[in-house]
A protein has these predicted regions:
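Secondary-structure edge/capping motif, primarily at the C-terminal ends of alpha-helices
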Residues: 73, 77, 108, 159-160
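Hydrophobic/aromatic-rich alpha-helical bundle segments in the mid-to-C-terminal region
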Residues: 101-102, 106, 114-126, 131-188
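Actinobacteria-biased recognition of intrinsically disordered, low-complexity terminal regions
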Residues: 1-7, 184-188
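Helix-turn-helix
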Residues: 11, 15, 19-53, 57
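Solvent-exposed, amphipathic alpha-helical segments
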Residues: 15, 19-22, 65-73, 151-155
Length: 188
């Protein structure tokens, strides 16, 4: 039985992410990806012309999901409920994508790819803190939103916390995010 084009592409992206974790985006070559997959470099080129395209494709599903979280939150009338929806969605996304988040937080190569993939769209990274603070936020609230976002991402992708189970990590990330944002603790 042969692998389908989609299966190969998925394996390629998973392999690339694993190599990015070890070597960084800049330290990973197309040849390294091909070797790790057991295919030729030409087979990698069949799916992606450049490493930048691979890097963007690795980040794209999570960015698309984050954008959907923000779009859905925008339909919620109460600002407090929007904040809860965004924070819960972000925490869930971070916990499910720990390895990607770790690379994103530590490797400028993936950060550049994310910026390229957001080109021409309303920037998710601008919408995210704005959704947490609302339109009339003061400087303190804006700083708190950025600290909460950075903290959730950095802690969620921290190698020191990789052994923690998803449920426990998610609960703690949500609790800390709420405290930073001055939100009430979520009831169990």
């Amino acid at each position: 039985m042969t692998a389908t084009k989609g299966d190969t592409r998925t394996r390629l992206l998973e392999t690339a992410l694993g190599l990015f974790t070890v070597h960084g985006v800049e330290g990973t070559s197309l040849q390294m990806i091909a070797d790790a997959l057991g295919v030729t470099k030409a087979a990698v080129y069949y799916h992606f012309r450049t490493k930048d395209e691979i890097t963007e494709a690795v980040a794209e599903p999570a960015l698309r999901e984050l954008s959907a979280i923000l779009d859905n939150a925008a339909t919620i009338r109460r600002h407090g409920a929007q904040v809860e929806y965004v924070l819960d969605g972000l925490v869930d996304l971070v916990v499910r994508n720990r390895v990607l988040v770790a690379v994103f937080c530590s490797d400028p190569g993936i950060a550049r790819a994310v910026e390229r993939s957001l080109h021409g769209e309303e920037n998710v990274m601008t919408r995210l803190p704005a959704m947490l603070v609302g339109p009339d936020a003061d400087d303190s609230a804006i700083v708190a939103a950025h600290v909460a976002l950075a903290g959730v991402a950095l802690a969620g992708g921290s190698p020191a916390l990789m052994a923690m189970d998803d449920e426990t990590l998610g609960r703690h990330l949500g609790d800390v995010g709420r405290r930073i944002l001055g939100r009430p603790r979520k009831r169990d």
